[in-house]
């Protein structure tokens, strides 16, 4: 309709909530399913959109990864590994698609919301949120709005930045 594609945000993701210590809680099909959505899906989207993005001349791809891919934490080992792979793929795609397309990733930490509360269990969610708000340097956690703001920053600005991942965690990595 508009004849161009200036931005692509790969925000689809999935997980299976399994404690990292529960090695029997995940099997090969769990890994394949999680990788399919979290890594292969974004690759296929970029591959399908690359010509339109390059034709724009100054396009941006933003992959939504996770602090799990930086720190090896999160809902499951498969999820952490998939988000680490997405961060690495972000760097590879930045090399391939430049100079016409910038490719970056945002890596949210704990995100406030019902989805996470349901996955973690309300008690664990509230305890984690309270801990992070008390101990992180910024004394707050991510919100969907703060994630969107960072994605928009990569799309509308940061014209010299590609191949990077931005951790959105209120300073959690500093603990």
Where are these regions (language model features)?
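Active-site helix of classical SDR
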Residues: 46, 82, 90
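Substrate-binding pocket helix/loop in short-chain dehydrogenase/reductase
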Residues: 19-23, 27-32, 132
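Residue(s) in the substrate-gating loop at a strand-loop-helix junction
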Residues: 66
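Alpha-helical segment proximal to the catalytic Tyr-Lys
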Residues: 51, 94-99
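C-terminal substrate-recognition "lid" of short-chain dehydrogenase/reductases
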Residues: 46, 140-168, 173
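Short, flexible catalytic-loop segment of classical short-chain dehydrogenase/reductase
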Residues: 107-118
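Short, small/polar-rich loop/turn modules that mediate ligand/substrate recognition or access, typified
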Residues: 98-102, 161-163
